[in-house]
Every structure is written in C-alpha cells, then in structure tokens.
Amino acid sequence: MGIHDLSKVIADKAPDAIKETEIKNLFDRKVAIDASMSIYQFLIAIRSEGSNLVNEAGEATSHLSGLFYRTIRMVNHGIKPLYVFDGKPPTMKSGELLKRGARRKEAQANLEEATEQGDTEQMEKFSRRLVHVTREHNEQCRQLLTLMGIPFIIAPTEAEAQCAELVKGGKVFATATEDMDALTFGTTVLLRHMTFSEARKMPIQEFRLQKGGLEMSMEEFIDMCILLGCDYCDSIKGIGRQKAYQLIKEHKNIETVLKHLDPKKYVIPEDWHFAEARELFLRPDVTPAAECEFKWTTPDIDGLVKFMCQENGFAEDRIRKSAEKLVKARKGGQQGRLDSFFTAIPSGSAKRNTVGLLPKPGPPPFLF
C-alpha cells in the first residue's frame, strides 16, 4: 500500500518538491530499484491482444520479458540499475498481509462470478487482483539479472527501506518505486514510473522533499505518514490527508494529536502501535550502505539465450539482438555526468533536520 495519499499531500502542499523528467536525464546515475514492485507491474501487464506471456508449460513469463527489456532500456540511456529484493516482511506488516490475503479471496470469488457471466472486463479486473509475486518469480528474475550482468541485493526486510539506505549512504542517486513510503524511510530522491513501458507515455516523477516543501522534521513527517495510513498499523478513521497534515503542523507528533482529538468524533484503533511504526521507519532493519558492494559485469549472451529461449520460449533472434545491445550499451556508458565534476556548496546552517529544508549532513546531492 505504501503511504495513502502522500503524493497528493506533496503535490498540494509542496509542489516544488515534484518535477517531471525523462529517462535520458538520468544518464550515468546509479538507481536502486524496488524489484518486487517492478516484477508485480510486469506480471499484471496484459498484451494488446489480451493474453499473458507464457512458456510451453503455461507458466507466466511476462515478468522476465518486462525485466529484460526495461532494464536494457535503462542501460541504453546510461543508467546503472541496482535491483533490491524484499527479504522477510517485518512482524508489524502481518496485519496488512492478512488483509491482502482476504482481498485476494474476495477477488477469486468475484472472478468466478464474472467468468460465469462472461463479463470479460470484470474478469480482467479481478484477475489482476489475484496476481502476487512468488518466490519462484524472484528466483527467476535474479537468475536473469545475473546473466545480464546487473547487480542485485536482497534486503533484510523491506526493499524500499534498503533502497533509502543506499541513497542516504551515497551508493546510489535515487530510489525507483511506486511506493511512497520510500520517502518515509528517508530516501532523498524518489523516482516513480521508472520501469513503466514507453507505450504508457507516463513521464518519470522525481520527488525531492529537501528541495522545497513541507517544512517538517523527519519525525513529524513520519507521524503524518502514519496518520495518512501505512502498512504497519491502522489509521484513524475520518482523518484524511488535509486533516493529517493540519494536525501534525499544529501539534508536531501523534502523542499530542491524541490529546486534542475529540473522542466522540474520532475512534482511536484498539492497541494502536503507532510508536512502533514510527520506530520502524526511523530505524528499519537494513544492511548498512557501507557494507553493500555491487558491480556491473559483462552480460552472458549464450547464457541469456539458453535461459530466455530454450527454457522460457522467447524468440532467439530478438533475445540475442537485445543482449548484444546491452553489451554495447555497457561498453559505451563510460562518459560521466557533467555535474559529477562539481561539488555542491551547502548554504547556511540548519537548526534541525527538516523535510523541505536541509537533510542531515552526508554526501553531496550530486554524486554520479
């Protein structure tokens, strides 16, 4: 789920923190990509003729196709992608996972009803809701990335948190995901729509809260996100995005908010673990950036052909030509960014770490 309506809050209250950009503007950037989110997008992608990509055994292969071609597209534009896979979900996410399971059961029942009625539009709708990324999908994608020479890491828990750690530690320029909670975990640059197909014509959205925005401390921002609704605890019914923003701007933290809420109007969730959720965002279980080492290597063309064509039924001529493009792009992507030759000069001093003002001391914003 990420953070409910956070993108709308930022668009409304801090529009300067969002800009639209093109993939060509990310030349020579290292980007940490939320692998599970990308794989999910590839799995639900339906071909124009309405059928999923499958191999001879009838197993879906759209995730392999999407990962292969979108990654090559990024490399062709000089981007150095690093995929980050989810590890074990945090214990606090168990409630959200149970809700997702219940929604899938409901979708299955609705799909069966739509199938009986021959309603193709509803069938497609509920089929998408049944899609989830499996261990096998992840293993296949990691095998493909290895053959492509593209690095990946497996996070201890949440991929978004690990991506944010890599950004904060100066290992990569940005986090690429559709989940806005990457900002709540502290990434300074968030890219949305990064792995969307060109056919969707969706510009990449770049979020940089430190470049103009909400004027909240990180702790205040996290508490606002919890009020908006996150994966780790319930939210207060009746508090929408405007109210959540207003309450935190006025009271600074959830503890003080609760002292001023009308109990007749707002019902606080029973056993509401907002403090634990806050701690999870502030200090997530991640591998320290300094301990993360990865490199981009030469693609194994013959290995790619064997895996993609012989094992998964893709056309050899297309795979081989694309793999050769990948090799060429890797060799040609050596020129650095112009701004990598300059050092950002900090302006003034900050009294506290604020979202929308200055980040904590760390690496300069232009590293790659």
Curated annotation (Swiss-Prot):
DNA binds at residues 47, 70, 158, 229, 231. Residues 103-123 are annotated as: Disordered. Its EC number is 3.1.-.-. It comes from the Eukaryota. Binds 2 magnesium ions per subunit. They probably participate in the reaction catalyzed by the enzyme. May bind an additional third magnesium ion after substrate binding. GO terms for biological process: base-excision repair; DNA replication, removal of RNA primer. Residues 334-342 are annotated as: Interaction with PCNA. It is found in: Nucleus, Nucleolus; Nucleus, Nucleoplasm; Mitochondrion. It is an enzyme of class 3 (hydrolase). Residues 122-251 are annotated as: I-domain. Keywords: DNA damage, DNA repair, DNA replication, Endonuclease, Exonuclease, Hydrolase, Magnesium, Metal-binding, Mitochondrion, Nuclease, Nucleus, Phosphoprotein. Its cofactor is Mg(2+). Phosphorylated. Phosphorylation upon DNA damage induces relocalization to the nuclear plasma. Pfam families: XPG_I (PF00867), XPG_N (PF00752). The keyword Hydrolase applies. GO terms for molecular function: 5'-3' exonuclease activity; 5'-flap endonuclease activity; DNA binding; magnesium ion binding; manganese ion binding; RNA-DNA hybrid ribonuclease activity. GO terms for cellular component: mitochondrion; nucleolus; nucleoplasm; nucleus. Residues 1-104 are annotated as: N-domain. Interacts with PCNA. Three molecules of FEN1 bind to one PCNA trimer with each molecule binding to one PCNA monomer. PCNA stimulates the nuclease activity without altering cleavage specificity. Structure-specific nuclease with 5'-flap endonuclease and 5'-3' exonuclease activities involved in DNA replication and repair. During DNA replication, cleaves the 5'-overhanging flap structure that is generated by displacement synthesis when DNA polymerase encounters the 5'-end of a downstream Okazaki fragment. It enters the flap from the 5'-end and then tracks to cleave the flap base, leaving a nick for ligation. Also involved in the long patch base excision repair (LP-BER) pathway, by cleaving within the apurinic/apyrimidinic (AP) site-terminated flap. Belongs to the XPG/RAD2 endonuclease family. FEN1 subfamily. This is Flap endonuclease 1. The lineage of its organism: Eukaryota, Choanoflagellata, Craspedida, Salpingoecidae, Monosiga.
